[in-house]
């Protein structure tokens, strides 16, 4: 992308002034041009801007507002401009402020008076609102596809490790045994909800502002439903003031993105922990690790650490845009020019984070022996003992909890596991305990017993993964 900040800037400033400067005696200062220009970032809207202009021109011709010849010239000119931008031959000018005026000025250069008719019954207010909605809609579709890919990777890993034990944690302390597959499927559920939130945001944003003009609509006999349909919107927006003055569609998108980034950050944090030497549950290949400039032995999980950090960009974008919008009276204010950069940056961060997580999940090697060894540590089957007391001896759960707690204390004082206590030790706390108690104290027994819906039993994990893979295969 080439942005022309100096060469011809005076000429371009005059041309920009010609777009809106009829009542001005002089042009903007260099500082005013710099602070006013958004072309440095909104050039990414060029595809959406051209698409919106093509739909608008077709509607103007259909309704008799411009001639068919003018519409044909506009279509030809915009198509050629699109090819120029695609090929990197378009010089964007800071003096022309934004993507809209850059394209319009170039169009007028190419086709003359017909290009100046394009902006009939349109304002930059409804133009940018339309472009931005189109861009966010495209971004949602792209991120949704990436999230679905990550979900598939997680499901396939979960199937592979549906029966491989690992410690489940609360407070990062050993709690109960689960399977690695069950743990991974938790993130599939989170990502499924993330995609649902993005889909909800997409549905609400899919109304077309074009035709709202500056804020009050237009006196020209336009057909807003025609342009809405041409651009893939469900309907035109219902209120012209609302259409040009709100960015809640972008805020909702950033909110959904922030929640998804938080989930990716949590997954990445766990990968960092699992890769650490004290855990050593998984290993990432050289493709997703880096070394140290001084310590030759180091293999750092930098990809995971960077994903963990990128949530700051995404949530920062949400807070930033909320702050921009919170005090604005209706309708449009120039403050709203600051809406796009945070959305673009957050989208880039989310896309890169999804790609990195997808790559890491497909790349990692699970150390199942290490996980299995730790799965039984920290008295992780204590709840199984308490459940046995309730189920077999009919003790109230709170009583069983206290009995089990005393047995844990005894085992801990001796430096042994629960299963290393003798039957006599256990009967000293609860006389009704029999030899059968030891059968529930194994990791495998604990995991196999968790057959409740959503539980960690291997068959549950396999069924959950298969269900999600079927859903994803059907494009949902």
From Swiss-Prot:
Q: Which reaction does it catalyse?
A: 2-(N(omega)-L-arginino)succinate = fumarate + L-arginine
Any one Gene Ontology MF annotation carried by this entry is: argininosuccinate lyase activity
Give the signal peptide range. none
The primary site where this protein sits is cytoplasm
Q: Where in the cell is it found?
A: Cytoplasm
| Keyword Nucleotide-binding assigned | no
Q: Which PROSITE patterns match?
A: FUMARATE_LYASES
Pfam families xref list: ASL_C2, Lyase_1
Please tell me whether the keyword Cytoplasm is annotated for this protein.
yes
Q: What is its EC number?
A: 4.3.2.1
Q: Which domain of life is it from?
A: Bacteria
Q: Pathway, per Swiss-Prot/TrEMBL?
A: Amino-acid biosynthesis; L-arginine biosynthesis; L-arginine from L-ornithine and carbamoyl phosphate: step 3/3
Broad EC category: lyase
The alphabetical list of record keywords is: Amino-acid biosynthesis, Arginine biosynthesis, Cytoplasm, Lyase
A biological process from GO: arginine biosynthetic process via ornithine
| Ranges annotated as spanning the membrane | none
Give the matching HAMAP family. Answer: Arg_succ_lyase
Provide the family line: Belongs to the lyase 1 family. Argininosuccinate lyase subfamily.
Specify the protein name.
Argininosuccinate lyase
Species assigned in the record = Gluconacetobacter diazotrophicus (strain ATCC 49037 / DSM 5601 / CCUG 37298 / CIP 103539 / LMG 7603 / PAl5)
* Lineage per the UniProt record: Bacteria, Pseudomonadati, Pseudomonadota, Alphaproteobacteria, Acetobacterales
Q: Which gene encodes it?
A: argH
